[in-house]
Design a protein with these regions (language model features):
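Short, well-structured alpha-helical segments that form the helix of a local strand-helix-strand
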Residues: 421-429, 486-500, 515-523
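Charged C-terminal helix
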Residues: 104, 285, 501-532
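Glycine-rich phosphate/dinucleotide-binding loop and adjoining beta-alpha-beta core of small-molecule
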Residues: 1-5, 45-216, 269-458, 531
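Glycine/serine-rich anion-binding loops at beta->alpha junctions
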Residues: 55-71, 241-244, 252-264, 268, ...
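Positively charged, low-complexity intrinsically disordered leader regions
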Residues: 1-48, 205-242
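Short pre-catalytic strand/loop immediately N-terminal to key active-site residues, enriched for Gly-Thr
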Residues: 20-27, 256, 425, 453-467
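Radical SAM [4Fe-4S] cluster-binding motif and immediate context
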Residues: 237-295
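Short, small-residue alpha-helix embedded
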Residues: 378, 465-496
Length: 532
């Protein structure tokens, strides 16, 4: 597990390291500069004899940049130093770096030249930026991006200039980096779009800030790395049988919607409840699955027996929003005492029917919701409408009121969704006492009552294909059936799903991928994680 920090959390770590532990800020700055140069060398970026532009601001990020330029010059780079901003407002450390450079005979320009460079180090703004970029700073960023278009390698110091460290928002304009070297910990803006698209490759460098600098304020954000995967996967007993590794009951499929049922079911040992029209194709595609089909409405006793057999229920993929689906989901929510994953039409049914909403909120075990942005919007609208009606009777908690004050507010919240994702997702998790895996280009996972929030770093745009979410629901259900707790199942499921998508893209390319290719790539990912 790796931490993802907000700007104020990182600032607190810096301050405690300097003032509490006693490591001088200039030492940290020198360590930061060394880490950037090391990152460039590790990636075999040509440096000796190459023209490098250091674009520095007046804050400590600029000081880092000036120190980087000094080190690059020592290994043979032809360095041009450019300092943008009011020189009367230099930070103490940046002023010291300017003095060092002048003592060494370097010139520092106050205006960029139109030369072409082999490399640009972006050190204009760090994680403290909080307003729109205009004027000469905007011109400087545009020139850096132009250098990139001309073929220069762009390395951003800590975060690309112009990106909000907390949300990934662009403050008017931003540097498009090839590599970003983050100091000590990743920041939210590195992992959330659009900032993630501007970050390029992310390298997190140890500059000497210890975890003790958190004191008792442990960061809430975290993500996984590939090297952790083997430890995250549930163990397998050498004397286990087919029932040892979990049994999933899948409520999926409707007329002309058998595909979602098949895609979701490929990841696990399962029993499927689906309309009779899907029997033949499901049996052909998933011969391993146990199957119960029905005409009209499912038999209640048959559903109860299926629930007794299962360890986990997955409901929703392709099941439609008709009366039979409503009755089936209603019965399962009332009767099941299992962890439950609700996806796709299951989520739409929750948003449509107050009874289902109330049953979901009172579910006896773990409830995991996996909405894409459109489904999330419908759930938010339902939550805000419910909140408005409850407020009339003075029954709503203040915390939920603040998240969903009225039905009209849902539109405004979703308009500002990129900047308010964490608040919105946490609010929905609280409303339904659930785990919410909010699918997006950068999926987040939050749980009611839990401070931690998971930031997914795997996956790619080739996964934006019909059925991809059905595969995810099956993966999460399979992990939960093996005994993992709900939050860990959702986090690991999202990460594995993205890794499988990355593997499929590697083999087929983004344009050639289908959801079934993600399924086919899961064994490759698992084999790499557990090669023995």
């Amino acid at each position: 597990m790796k931490y993802v920090l907000k700007a104020d959390e990182m600032k607190a770590c810096d301050e405690y390291t300097i003032n509490g532990i006693g490591i001088p800020s200039m030492v940290l700055m020198e360590r930061a500069a060394l880490s950037v140069v090391s990152a460039l060398e590790e990636r075999k970026i040509p440096l000796k004899g190459k023209k490098a532009l250091i674009a520095a601001g007046t804050g400590n990020n600029g000081g880092d940049g000036l120190a980087i330029g000094r080190l690059l010059s020592r290994i043979g780079a032809e360095v041009t130093f450019y300092l943008e901003g009011n020189l009367q407002k230099l930070s103490v450390e940046t002023k010291a770096q300017v003095r060092i450079l002048k003592n060494m005979g370097f010139s520092i320009l106050s205006k960029t030249e139109d030369d072409e460079y082999d490399m640009v180090v972006d050190a204009l703004f760090g994680i403290g930026l909080s307003g729109e970029i205009t004027g000469s700073f905007k011109e400087a960023i545009e020139k850096i991006n132009r250098q990139k278009e001309w073929g220069a390698f762009v390395c951003s110091v800590d975060i690309p200039s112009g990106i909000c460290a907390d949300t990934g928002k662009i403050y008017g304009c931003a540097v498009k980096a090839d590599l970003t070297v983050a100091f000590a910990f990743a920041k939210r803006g590195h992992l959330l779009y659009p900032g993630r698209a501007y970050t390029g490759e992310l390298a997190v460098a140890d500059i000497g800030i210890p975890k003790a600098a958190f004191r008792e304020a442990i960061p809430s954000g975290f993500y996984y790395g590939k090297e952790e995967l083997s430890k995250l996967l549930p163990g397998r007993s050498p004397w286990g049988n087919k029932g040892t590794f979990g049994k999933v009951l899948l409520l999926a499929g409707s007329h002309d919607m058998s595909g979602a049922c098949i895609l979701c079911g490929k990841a696990v040992l399962l029993k499927i409840i689906t309309p009779a029209c899907n029997r033949e194709i499901v049996q052909q595609s998933l011969p391993e699955a146990l199957l119960y089909t029905f005409e009209g409405r499912p038999d209640e006793e048959a559903v109860k027996k299926a629930l007794l057999w299962a360890d986990v229920v997955v409901a929703g993929p392709g099941m439609g929003c008709g009366e039979a689906s409503y009755q089936l989901l209603s019965q399962v929510l009332e009767s099941a005492s299992h962890p439950m994953v609700i996806d796709a039409d299951g989520l739409n049914l929750l948003a449509m029917h107050r009874k289902l909403w109330e049953l979901a909120g009172g579910h006896k075990d773990t409830l995991i919701l996996t909405p894409h942005p459109g489904e999330l919007m419908r759930l938010i609208k339902a939550a805000s409408t419910e909140a408005a009606s409850m407020q009339a009777g003075h029954q709503r908690e203040a915390s939920v009121q603040s998240a969903y004050p009225q039905s009209e507010a849902s539109g405004a919240l979703m308009t500002e969704y990129p900047a308010n994702r964490e608040t919105i997702i946490r609010g929905l998790a609280k409303e339904l006492k659930a785990i919410v895996a909010a699918k997006d280009a950068a999926t987040l996972v939050a749980e009611d009552g839990r401070d931690e929030i998971f930031f997914n770093t795997s996956g790619n745009d080739g996964m934006a294909a019909a059925g991809s979410g059905d595969v995810l629901a099956g993966i999460i259900g399979g992990l939960a059936a093996q005994g993992m707790n709900g939050f860990e199942s959702a986090c690991l499921g999202v990460y594995l799903h993205g890794l499988a998508g990355d593997e499929a893209r590697r083999k087929l390319g983004a344009y050639g991928m289908l959801a079934g290719d993600i399924c086919e790539s899961i064994p490759d990912v698992m084999r790499k994680a557990s090669p023995v």
